[in-house]
């Protein structure tokens, strides 16, 4: 499934009935969110609003509104194929040399994919077809959405932020929301542990008082966008990973005003800087929790240049109580996480982040239990192995006879295999998403682990219950005579 840029991808979606063009004038203030939310909840297509009220630039929304479109963006036919992406990432995280000719032959596809990792640098690029700078910069010309009635201001939601630390060769790509506060100013809301914020902190330490260069790409190709939200190894750039997904090298171009490299095919690029002395209160905004978040101070991003393609498209989304687009992304990326975790913990059978748990706040893990205390080791591993699970508040561990994705199974295991005092692990004073207002202190809270596995000697002194199993001969006999019983006149089986 090949595409070169966002426009190629939209053509592919339209051919498959996965894109709907909206010609009726619709207001970016609240109305686009309402339409996109209804469409996403119905499993509908990506939406291209061609006539947003008050603007000449179209708005793309709900691009990754189904797991299928996330998989397509990663170059795969369906969600199940994302397990292979996870296996590739697990290999890149801890590459192993071939153990012999046969192993080398088996790993050739992985080595071949690695050839697409280096970026291709262009002298000129579509994203620089039109350039404005200085006083001509006006972010109000972009149809930035206001998503919820009590939001503080219009909000950029799909901005691919490009940064580089003072002592690093590779750039960092991250998705951080940005509040519009002036014709050339945005608030950069990045949490302190995220890559862009870490680059900024290192810059301030190395160059006190100096401006920190930042660029933001809007409407990059899907592989690059998804690369920025995928748990790539720290040694691998998001551009390199995008090349692996796409099957071709990622094309980049140097910015007009700084040395950062941005996706050459991006629809819009914002170039500028962060002044360490300029902060502003951000929010409140309706967030993925389904609540408005607290107001907090973050750095101000001053835009000095806007470059864009001819007839540029503005890519946007909204966040709210699941399901929303981030929740759908979480469902799809869940398949990527599983092989990465299994590489470190082979006993893990499945790993599931229920979307109704805000995509990351609760995890269900099933394991092949091998010893007493095994479930607790897995809990600690989930919390510590990947940064993505730093904010996971609840981890439920079950045996492999439980379907991690079936709440009927999980609740049955919790209520029959757990003693609340013995099998609950509480860890206090751990990092928590600052958006989690349920924690007693902003950014610091507790975690709970639930051991819903069968208990081994040493974990209990009682004889453990034996699960009921049907007699297979009786089952086979009843299967054979079921239709004759005619219990359900419509032929329904039981």
From Swiss-Prot:
Pathway where this protein functions: Cofactor biosynthesis; ubiquinone biosynthesis
Pfam assignment, any one: UbiD_C
Any one Gene Ontology molecular-function term assigned to this protein's record: 3-octaprenyl-4-hydroxybenzoate carboxy-lyase activity
Binding site for prenylated FMN: 175-177, 189-191, 194-195
Enzyme Commission designation: 4.1.1.98
Binding site for Mn(2+): 172, 238
Locations listed in the record: Cell membrane
Enzyme type, top EC level: lyase
Gene Ontology cellular component annotations, sorted alphabetically: cytosol; plasma membrane
Gene3D superfamilies: Single helix bin (1.20.5.570), UbiD C-terminal domain-like (3.40.1670.10)
InterPro entries named among the record's database cross-references: UbiD (IPR002830), UbiD-like_C (IPR049381), UbiD-like_N (IPR049383), UbiD_bacteria (IPR023677), UbiD_Rift_dom (IPR048304)
GO biological process: ubiquinone biosynthetic process
Active-site residues per Swiss-Prot or TrEMBL entry: 287 (proton donor)
Cofactor(s) needed for function: prenylated FMN; Mn(2+)
Membrane topology type: Peripheral membrane protein
Cofactor binding, per record: Binds 1 prenylated FMN per subunit.
Catalytic activity: a 4-hydroxy-3-(all-trans-polyprenyl)benzoate + H(+) = a 2-(all-trans-polyprenyl)phenol + CO2
Keywords: Cell membrane, Decarboxylase, Flavoprotein, FMN, Lyase, Manganese, Membrane, Metal-binding, Ubiquinone biosynthesis
Annotated function: Catalyzes the decarboxylation of 3-octaprenyl-4-hydroxy benzoate to 2-octaprenylphenol, an intermediate step in ubiquinone biosynthesis.
Family recorded in the similarity comment: Belongs to the UbiD family.
PANTHER family noted in UniProt: 3-OCTAPRENYL-4-HYDROXYBENZOATE CARBOXY-LYASE-RELATED (PTHR30108), FERULIC ACID DECARBOXYLASE 1 (PTHR30108:SF17)
Complex formation: Homohexamer.
Record's protein name: 3-octaprenyl-4-hydroxybenzoate carboxy-lyase
Organism: Shigella flexneri serotype 5b (strain 8401)
């Amino acid at each position: 499934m090949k595409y070169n840029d966002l426009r190629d991808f939209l053509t592919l979606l339209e051919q498959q009935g996965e894109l709907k063009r909206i010609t009726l004038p619709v207001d970016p203030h609240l109305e686009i969110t309402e339409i996109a939310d209804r469409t996403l909840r119905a499993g509908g297509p990506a939406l291209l609003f061609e006539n947003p009220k008050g603007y000449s630039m179209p708005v793309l929304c709900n691009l990754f509104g189904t797991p299928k479109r996330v998989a397509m963006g990663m170059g795969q036919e369906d969600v199940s194929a994302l397990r292979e992406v996870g296996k590739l990432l697990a290999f890149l995280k801890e590459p192993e040399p071939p153990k012999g000719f046969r192993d080398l032959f088996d790993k050739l596809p992985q080595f071949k994919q690695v050839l697409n990792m280096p970026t291709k640098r262009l002298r000129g690029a579509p994203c620089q077809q039109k350039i404005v700078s200085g006083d001509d910069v006006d972010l109000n010309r972009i149809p930035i959405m206001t998503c919820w009635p009590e939001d503080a201001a219009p909000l950029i939601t799909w901005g691919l932020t490009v940064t580089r630390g003072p002592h690093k060769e590779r750039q960092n790509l991250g998705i951080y929301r940005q509040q519009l506060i002036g014709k050339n100013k945005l608030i950069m809301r990045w949490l302190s542990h995220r890559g862009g914020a870490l680059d900024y902190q290192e810059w301030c330490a190395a160059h006190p008082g100096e401006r920190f260069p930042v660029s933001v790409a809007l409407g990059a190709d899907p592989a690059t966008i998804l690369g920025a939200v995928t748990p790539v190894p720290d040694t691998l750039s998001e551009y390199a990973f995008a090349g692996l997904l796409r099957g071709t090298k990622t094309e980049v171009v140097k910015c007009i005003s700084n040395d950062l490299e941005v996706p050459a095919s991006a629809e819009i690029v914002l170039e500028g800087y962060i002044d360490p002395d300029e902060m502003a209160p951000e929010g409140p905004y309706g967030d993925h929790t389904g609540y408005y978040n607290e107001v907090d101070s973050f750095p101000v991003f001053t835009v000095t240049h806007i470059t864009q393609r001819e007839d540029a498209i503005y890519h946007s989304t909204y966040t709210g109580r699941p399901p929303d687009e981030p929740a759908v992304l979480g469902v799809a990326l869940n398949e990527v996480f599983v092989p990465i975790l299994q590489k470190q913990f082979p006993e893990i059978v499945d790993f599931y982040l229920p979307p109704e748990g805000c995509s990351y706040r609760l995890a269900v893990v099933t394991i092949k239990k091998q010893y007493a205390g095994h479930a607790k080791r897995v809990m600690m591993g989930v919390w510590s192995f990947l940064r993505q699970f730093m904010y996971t508040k609840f981890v439920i561990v079950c045996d492999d006879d439980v379907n991690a994705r079936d709440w009927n199974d999980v609740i049955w295991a919790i209520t029959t295999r757990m003693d609340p005092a013995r099998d609950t692990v509480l860890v206090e004073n751990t990092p928590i998403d600052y958006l989690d207002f349920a924690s007693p202190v902003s950014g610091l809270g507790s975690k709970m682990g639930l051991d819903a596995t069968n208990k081994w000697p040493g974990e209990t002194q009682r004889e453990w219950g034996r699960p009921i199993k049907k007699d297979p001969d009786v089952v086979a006999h009843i299967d054979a005579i079921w239709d004759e019983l005619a219990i359900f006149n419509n032929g329904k089986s039981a």
